[in-house]
């Protein structure tokens, strides 16, 4: 498949893509939302957002612009980058930016929401990076509900910001890095104006596709056979 379409309550589009080094787009900030109100496992009301997962940014962009007319006005956007990315070589491609403190040291959704609200009172776009998602353990909130050991197992999945983006009606793109189960998360305020800058930033953060996995899966699709020549 070239494209996956799914719903995201608390990270169900963002994190499958991130854990598999795929690209994703969450459209909660541009009204790609369900009208049904639900409650999360930690008692937060939300309606599910709609998003896309793809192997490349071009396919993702085509899907988004097919559904959403780009209404972006020519204006300047204030971009914040978490300061743990100051030495990141890809971040150097973004010239107009401000580094801010990465104080997301809790997995608590309310705490994350409060901190993001403070950031988006001043900035339009935030760039973060989350790593080793669902690699050491599986971060499912149902699993984490069975005592302290299962809660720690859930926490070891390293999920943070992606758990609240839909609940806050934000728009986001994930761009995989060259490390396993790791991606940049580019997050924007609610509004159609941010579609273009989100994709422009995403294009600046792209790594070359892993050639071995590309050859493996392309050969499988073309020949219906997982055996290929190295």
Regions found by a protein language model. Name each.
Residues 1-64:
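Short glycine/serine-rich loop segments
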Residues 4, 96-99, 170-174:
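Conserved beta-strand scaffold positions in the cores of enzyme catalytic domains, especially
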Residues 6-9, 27-29, 55-57, 82-84, ...:
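Fold-independent oxyanion-binding glycine-rich loops
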Residues 14-20, 37, 91-93, 138-141, ...:
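Short acidic, glycine/serine/threonine-rich loops at helix termini
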Residues 36-43, 66-74, 172-179:
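Short, flexible, solvent-exposed loop/turn segments with mixed acidic/basic and small polar residues
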Residues 61, 117-230:
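Glycine-rich, small-residue loops and helix-cap segments
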Residues 65-138:
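Gly/Ser-rich, acidic/histidine-flanked active-site/gating loops
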């Amino acid at each position: 498949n070239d494209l996956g379409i799914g719903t995201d309550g608390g990270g169900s589009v963002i994190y499958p893509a991130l854990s598999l080094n795929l690209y994703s787009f969450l459209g909660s900030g541009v009204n790609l939302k369900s009208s049904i109100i639900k409650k999360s496992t930690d008692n937060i009301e939300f309606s599910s957002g709609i998003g896309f997962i793809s192997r490349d940014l071009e396919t993702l962009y085509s899907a988004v612009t097919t559904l959403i007319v780009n209404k972006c006005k020519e204006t300047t956007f204030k971009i914040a980058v978490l300061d743990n990315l100051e030495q990141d070589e890809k971040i150097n491609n973004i010239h107009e930016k401000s580094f801010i403190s990465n104080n997301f040291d809790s997995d608590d959704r309310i705490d994350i929401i409060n901190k993001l609200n403070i950031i988006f009172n001043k900035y339009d776009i935030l760039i973060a990076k989350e790593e080793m998602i669902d690699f050491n353990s599986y971060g499912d909130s149902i699993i984490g509900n069975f005592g302290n050991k299962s809660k720690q197992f859930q926490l070891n999945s390293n999920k943070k910001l992606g758990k609240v983006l839909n609940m806050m009606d934000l728009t986001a793109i994930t761009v995989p890095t060259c490390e396993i189960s790791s991606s940049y998360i580019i997050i924007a305020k609610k509004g159609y104006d941010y579609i273009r800058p989100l994709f422009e930033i995403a294009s600046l953060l792209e790594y070359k596709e892993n050639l071995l996995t590309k050859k493996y899966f392309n050969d499988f699709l073309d020949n219906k056979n997982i055996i290929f020549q190295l």
